[in-house]
A protein has these predicted regions:
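N-terminal secretory signal peptides that target proteins for export/translocation
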Residues: 1-2
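Sec-dependent N-terminal signal peptides of Gram-positive bacterial secreted proteins and lipoproteins
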Residues: 5-24
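A generic local structural motif
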Residues: 10, 102, 238-239
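Intrinsic disorder/low-structure terminal segments
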Residues: 12-13, 90, 97, 341
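Structured alpha-helical subdomains that flank or immediately precede key functional sites
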Residues: 19, 25-199, 247, 252, ...
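Predominantly the structural core of cysteine protease catalytic domains
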Residues: 95, 112, 117-126, 145-298, ...
Length: 366
C-alpha cells in the first residue's frame, strides 16, 4: 500500500479535566514526569464479613472524561457514519449461529495486577483490527503498561526532554498504580505500541518490576497503531454504542466492581450503588430482553427494566464470569457514561509520527 505521512499529531494528544485521584507528580529540571506520591490500588475487592474474598485485580482511575460526555448531535463527525445501521434487539458474538462474520479472540487474564485499563484498551483495539482489517492480533498489555509509566524520547526526537518515570518509594509496583483509557490513548497515539504479545509476553510482568524492559520494545516492535478514538455517552446514546460495537467489535467502559452485585447462578451483574473498585472492561454485545429478574431474587435488587450488555472481562475464564463473559444491566448505576471506541490500524499505515508531547496527562502536576 502507498504509505503516508502523519503530521499535526499533537492536537489529538491533549488530555484535559483530569480529576486529582491517586497520581501526583513533580516536574524536574529535565522536564521528566516522575511519580512521587501514589495511593495504593488494591488487587481485589474490599469485602465485608458476608462477602467472600476475590483475587481479581482492578485498577481503573476515573477521570472527568469518563463521566462528562456530551450527547451526539447531527453535526458530529465520525460518529454520524454509524447512524444508518439497523440495530437488532440481540447481538451476541458468543451465541451459536451468530452471523456477524467474526469470532471473539481468546479471553485474557490480568491476574494478579491492576492492569485492566491496558487489557480493555487493547481488547477494543484487537477487535477493531479484526472488524476493519480482518487481522487477528494478540497485543501486549505488558508493553503498553510498562512504557506508559517508563517512556522516553520518540525516534524522531520530537518529545526530547519529556518522559514519564515511576519512582514511588512507597509503592514501586507500576503494575498496580492503575490507569485509564486516556493513558492508553496518549501512549498508543504516540506509537508506543501496540506490540505483539509474543514480543513482550504478560508472563514476564513480575520480572519487569526488578529488571525492567529493554528500551527497544518501546517503539520498535509495534504491529498496530491507534489511529483515532472517540467517546459515546452510553446513558444517553445507547443505540449509537450498539452501532459502534457492530462496526468495530467492542467499546471500552469502566464500572465499580462489587462482589455482592454479581449473581453466579445467572452470570449477571447489577450494581445499584456508586461504590466498589474501579475496573475497565469491554462491551461486545447486548440483549434487550435479558430479564431484570436475572439480577437478583428480591425485587429491591433488580433494575426497573430488562436489558443487558455482554461484557468481556480480563479475569480469566471463571472469575465472576462464564468463560470470561458476563451480563451487566443497562441500568447499572456504577457504569461510567463514556464508551470509548478505539480505531486501530496495522502498523504500516504511516511512515512517521511527528509529535511534541511526551506526557501522559496535562494536570495533577504540583
Amino acid at each position: 500500500m502507498r504509505k503516508k505521512w502523519l503530521t499535526g499529531a499533537l492536537a489529538a494528544f491533549f488530555i484535559s479535566g483530569m480529576i486529582p485521584m491517586t497520581l501526583w507528580a513533580d516536574t524536574t529540571d529535565s522536564d521528566e514526569l516522575t511519580v512521587t506520591d501514589v495511593t495504593l490500588i488494591d488487587d481485589g475487592e474490599t469485602v465485608s464479613e458476608n462477602e467472600e474474598e476475590t483475587e481479581a485485580a482492578g485498577g481503573y482511575l476515573r477521570t472527568t472524561d469518563d463521566m462528562d460526555v456530551p450527547s451526539l448531535s447531527e453535526e458530529d463527525g465520525s460518529e454520524a457514519l454509524l447512524r444508518d445501521a439497523e440495530v437488532p434487539s440481540v447481538y451476541n458474538p458468543k451465541a451459536s449461529g451468530f452471523t456477524g462474520g467474526y469470532t471473539l479472540p481468546a479471553v485474557r487474564n490480568q491476574n494478579p495486577y491492576g492492569t485492566c485499563w491496558a487489557f480493555a484498551s487493547l481488547a477494543s483495539s484487537e477487535l477493531s483490527l479484526l472488524r476493519s482489517y480482518q487481522t487477528s492480533e494478540d497485543l501486549s498489555e505488558l508493553q503498553l503498561a510498562y512504557f506508559t509509566y517508563h517512556s522516553s524520547t520518540d525516534p524522531l526526537g520530537g518529545t526530547e526532554g519529556d518522559s514519564v518515570s515511576c519512582v514511588s518509594d512507597a509503592y514501586p509496583n507500576y503494575l498496580n498504580l492503575g490507569g485509564n483509557y486516556n493513558f492508553s490513548v496518549v501512549s498508543m497515539m504516540n506509537w508506543i505500541g501496540a506490540a505483539d504479545e509474543t514480543a513482550v509476553p504478560y508472563s514476564k510482568a513480575a520480572a519487569t518490576l526488578s529488571s525492567g524492559l529493554d528500551a527497544s520494545y518501546e517503539y520498535s516492535y509495534d504491529v498496530a497503531h491507534l489511529q483515532n478514538y472517540y467517546r459515546i455517552n452510553i446513558k444517553t446514546d445507547p443505540q449509537e454504542v450498539k452501532k459502534a460495537i457492530m462496526e468495530y467489535g467492542a467499546v471500552g467502559v469502566s464500572y465499580l466492581d462489587r462482589l455482592l452485585a454479581y449473581s453466579y447462578s445467572t452470570n449477571a451483574y447489577y450494581n445499584n450503588t456508586t461504590s466498589g473498585d474501579g475496573h475497565a472492561v469491554t462491551i461486545v454485545g447486548w440483549d434487550d430482553a435479558f430479564s431484570r429478574t436475572n439480577f437478583g431474587s428480591d425485587s429491591s435488587d433488580q433494575p426497573s427494566a430488562d436489558g443487558a450488555w455482554l461484557i468481556r472481562n480480563s479475569w480469566g475464564s471463571d472469575d465472576m464470569s462464564r468463560n470470561g463473559y458476563f451480563w451487566m444491566s443497562y441500568a447499572d448505576a456504577s457504569l461510567s457514561n463514556a464508551a470509548y471506541v478505539f480505531l486501530a490500524e496495522p502498523a504500516d499505515n504511516y511512515d512517521h509520527n511527528y509529535q511534541y508531547d511526551g506526557s501522559i496527562l496535562s494536570s495533577n502536576l504540583n
